[in-house]
């Protein structure tokens, strides 16, 4: 087999693995397949709660009363809106994180079905008008008194915002039976968390949002919600998107996932058996970023005194996380010098190429030496074409005598695959790349594909006209041609097809990939072209000497 065929096959193998990787990523992660959890940790709903399962199937939508008022609360990081009907949080905007329309991202909002992202159901108590009272700048109470079945209750919801600009809200529930000599008479209440986090741009497209999912962290494992799954005493349960999430932590909680109106909801079930009840929920509502999540693992790092909550486990870590950490560090160093994440990706690419340059140089030299052996190789192939075993033996003997490694030219190509996959995960999980502009007006966000025109509908499975995939395809073709040691005219039909076919296949596979990933690929191609010219000149000078 000729050296160029080996290299082309290595590239083809790389293409195959990239395609498989993209498909697996889309199937396993973007869709959050429920098969992730094979062994479920269950509790018996009837035994533990002594209630009718049919109660879980009730309609949890609520209509805001005409007498309801909106209460707006502002902190340095949040703009929150509460409704006095139900005392629910109906909108929560992140002031420091803007969407593509340059407006605060709304992480909690009312849905057309009159559902908030999370709310509490307590029979008639949940559908009452509450009185609002501001305790201080960070603590806000909603109170109501109501009669249920001849019994009178005082119901208080207390929302406490962080004084240290942490993305956490403490929700306290107080339920007091005014008839002190009587039991509460309510068996349980539910905290409902639905799949409602979205970011919409003016174009009407979901942004930064390659999945909407429920997750639960239990027994040191991250698991994904599915209909019918119930777990006792998890660390937290949450709903999230690519870059934002809402996580709920509570002591001794029991969680059930159930489809309601084709939407997966998580129900935190809480049994009541006292005359007076108080409960506490800690609700993280903010970026899916360890910078903000991990402070709740040590009580001295957060104003709520929380520890070992493990919110940071919601950020998935791939098998190549050990590569992503130094890559992220290198990007951060370059960004500190030149505050542009697009340039940081380009510099990271150059660093990677420099690190593997010794292998690349040896690879190219091995390919050149193999090209010189073509006459001898063809002679052996003709001589022993009817004896495959002897043919392989003679080829191996020739390689040993000439000191040539026949697969040496493949190593740099295959070595780049882990780097590519690691960067793919980094671009999808590195929060600072969200909304990071490289070239304003063209590449406005490195975490999504570039776009010069939005159709508003799908055209051949595409919604946008993008430029970077075309640049990638052209530079990939040039890189392949320059890396070859033979003239294009001498190539066979199959090799010509591989030369042109693979860049085109890469074009289709990577068309909708984040622009940060394509910048890495394009920079790699351009660097490879320049590098190959340098190597050829260097080898030419050595021959002349």
Curated annotation (Swiss-Prot):
Interacts with the Sec translocase complex via SecD. Specifically interacts with transmembrane segments of nascent integral membrane proteins during membrane integration. Keywords: Cell inner membrane, Cell membrane, Chaperone, Membrane, Protein transport, Transmembrane, Transmembrane helix, Transport. It is found in: Cell inner membrane. The chain crosses the membrane at residues 10-30, 319-339, 341-361, 407-427, 467-487, 502-522. Required for the insertion and/or proper folding and/or complex formation of integral membrane proteins into the membrane. Involved in integration of membrane proteins that insert both dependently and independently of the Sec translocase complex, as well as at least some lipoproteins. Aids folding of multispanning membrane proteins. InterPro entries: Membr_insert_YidC, Membr_insert_YidC_N, YidC/ALB3/OXA1/COX18, YidC/Oxa/ALB_C, YidC_ALB_C, YidC_periplasmic_sf. It is a multi-pass membrane protein. Belongs to the OXA1/ALB3/YidC family. Type 1 subfamily. GO terms for molecular function: membrane insertase activity. This is Membrane protein insertase YidC. One of its GO terms (cellular component) is plasma membrane. It comes from the Bacteria. One of its GO terms (biological process) is protein insertion into membrane.
